[in-house]
Amino acid sequence: MARSDVLVSTDWAESNLKAPKTVFVEVDEDTSAYDTGHIEGAVKLDWKTDLQDPIRRDFVDAQQFSKLLSERGIANDDTVILYGGNNNWFAAYAYWYFKLYGHQDVKLLDGGRKKWELDARPLSAEKVERPQTSYTAKEPDNSIRAFRDEVIAAIGTKNLVDVRSPDEFSGKILAPAHLPQEQSQRPGHIPGAINVPWSKAANEDGTFKSDEELAKLYAEAGLDGEKETIAYCRIGERSSHTWFVLQELLGHKNVKNYDGSWTEYGSLVGAPIELGS
């Protein structure tokens, strides 16, 4: 898959802000960032309130996703350009959602909000309202989603890529240092997992490293390109960024994101765990 199939540059984005059938969507870890200024015409998706089921621990289902995108004015045949802060951390998470529910034309803004601001490009504070559509999501494509039993069965047979920080991987902490630390019952990592922090795939300006640099990064960490791969982190957002790199940029086959990640796995009774680096 060519990079142009899944990424757009900030130059392209600024030239296509008002292009027909093109919708810019901001998704941030800091859900208030959009309100301080956003790309002109972009709509907001809140990863906490829009993409998560309000009762059970799971994503919104196809019906809920259809309702959400219809209300945001996104149609099935629109080109969706996703972007956000922190090297597209949650924008990649949303990209994976869109692919899970079968949206055909979705891309990331390479570098996200960080690159846009480094370029000194304009932000808008205007409220964005688009005409409502009748979006219809497909049934979820679980070929890109891993569940806990599959993850346990993958130990010793598939690539397991832990994309958290070295301190999370080794068991020193349970979550990124700026977040609460009571997210799971036990620290550590899945036995046999390799540790490639998600952020190593990005340059200083938030853009993705070259395919050659990315391939070298994972090969040197011990990833076997002939095997199936499951990526995980704490709640599935950082690992969706790695899923994007491996499947969409490098073209690996059979790559899955384990969105239950460590907050599920680290609380399972009897699940094998390793500590240390």
Curated annotation (Swiss-Prot):
Chemical reaction(s) catalysed: thiosulfate + hydrogen cyanide = thiocyanate + sulfite + 2 H(+)
Enzyme Commission number(s) from the entry: 2.8.1.1
Enzyme type, top EC level: transferase
Domain (Rhodanese): residue spans on this chain: 18-125, 154-274
Residues reported in the UniProt entry to bind substrate: 238
Domain writeup: Contains two rhodanese domains with different primary structures but with near identical secondary structure conformations suggesting a common evolutionary origin. Only the C-terminal rhodanese domain contains the catalytic cysteine residue.
Name this protein carries in UniProt: Putative thiosulfate sulfurtransferase
The organism of origin for this protein: Mycolicibacterium smegmatis (strain ATCC 700084 / mc(2)155) (Mycobacterium smegmatis)
